[in-house]
Amino acid sequence: MNMTKGALILSLSFLLAACSSIPQNIKGNNQPDIQKSFVAVHNQPGLYVGQQARFGGKVINVINGKTDTLLEISVLPLDSYAKPDIEANYQGRLLARQSGFLDPVNYRNHFVTILGTIQGEQPGFINKVPYNFLEVNMQGIQVWHLREVVNTTYNLWDYGYGAFWPEPGWGAPYYTNAVSQVTPELVK
């Protein structure tokens, strides 16, 4: 009996570890409001300076300096797994600063979630229009890869052409080649 309980506890712990929702590198210090509203922070950044926050979106520019790298991120709201909601509207932009070199190939045009400390705002431009960017010092980053899930139709009720036709024949359900839906999703 003890062996069964031990196996059950071990398997449940593996199951729970596999289902952990937010990657460790962007988990943060477990404060309840770490996933802040970007709009609220952007409107009054002075209230949030020094606080840890998690934001996500699409990296649209990578600026390498002598000692650090800035990621310009077009911000999207995050879901409960800290993934950017790719079907939502963009909320604004932020600059995420990381000491050292980050290769633009690994980040530009990718969806990311960052964890960092809010530093305030930094004036800049989007094209030639003045814009105040929220500035964040990065402590962690998760790059998400876009995967398209293709759902095809599976017809359970139509059994083919008849007994004298080759497969699928009678009694064999068949797949149609029609694509009914393509759903984009983000994965690690």
From Swiss-Prot:
It is a lipid-anchor. The keyword Lipoprotein applies. Residues 1-18 form the signal peptide. GO terms for cellular component: cell outer membrane; outer membrane. Pfam families: Slp. It is found in: Cell outer membrane. It comes from the Bacteria. A lipid is attached at C19 (S-diacylglycerol cysteine). InterPro entries: OMP_Slp (IPR004658). GO terms for molecular function: identical protein binding. Induction: Induced upon starvation and slowed growth. cAMP/CRP-independent. A lipid is attached at C19 (N-palmitoyl cysteine). Keywords: Cell outer membrane, Lipoprotein, Membrane, Palmitate, Signal. Its main location: membrane. Forms homooligomers. PANTHER family: OUTER MEMBRANE PROTEIN SLP (PTHR37530:SF1). The induction of Slp may help to stabilize the outer membrane during carbon starvation and stationary phase. This is Outer membrane protein Slp. It comes from Escherichia coli (strain K12).
